[in-house]
């Protein structure tokens, strides 16, 4: 059974690409048709590519690899944070800081500064400093937390990047490619798929589409960590309901519509 069904993808609007005048010809193989000046993505390809990406992420996490979720566009920010935290990984959802991968040592010094400021606030140091100085330190802490909060506990350079809209996250893509870090990404019709190791063709502008795909990548991480099939609680309850109904009315195959 595929990770995502055609019905789920359609309902989330994953099939809507960009306007035909804003496209990358390299995405032609992932385009099904054109409708009213909009490219329609071939969801059969998306289903297949999603399965491949899911298996890759799951297998890599089973080996202890870490993943950095990246999505700084408004439609992705909340989802990137929520799903990365849900699966216990790391994220960048505000702005990609130049050198985050290629100059990680310098980034680590900023993270240490953030942790230092957090300790000062917690241990009461702020209480004995002049109010003006404390205000400046708090502003510094909030700024560092905004941009580095999602990676403050990341122990090393990530092994994999998951990206929403590699065209927007161009600097992240370039740094990852320079270091040979594999990239999994939602790739819309205006992106270059050649730069991505695991292409997931889909709409990177719709919040529901981004949420659907990103949540499945997070599920792959959780399954990789647990070594077993992950199912949200709602799905587990549904499975129990299905079994109960089948036991009572096993002659009626149409009671539950999967």
From Swiss-Prot:
Highest taxon of source: Bacteria
Comp. bias intervals (Acidic residues): 246-258
Keywords, ordered alphabetically: Ribonucleoprotein, Ribosomal protein
Region Disordered, residue ranges: 227-258
PROSITE patterns: RIBOSOMAL_S2_1 (PS00962)
PANTHER family the UniProt entry points to: 30S RIBOSOMAL PROTEIN S2 PROKARYOTIC AND ORGANELLAR, SMALL RIBOSOMAL SUBUNIT PROTEIN US2M
Name the record gives this protein: Small ribosomal subunit protein uS2
Organism whose genome encodes this protein: Caldicellulosiruptor saccharolyticus (strain ATCC 43494 / DSM 8903 / Tp8T 6331)
Gene transcribed to yield this protein: rpsB
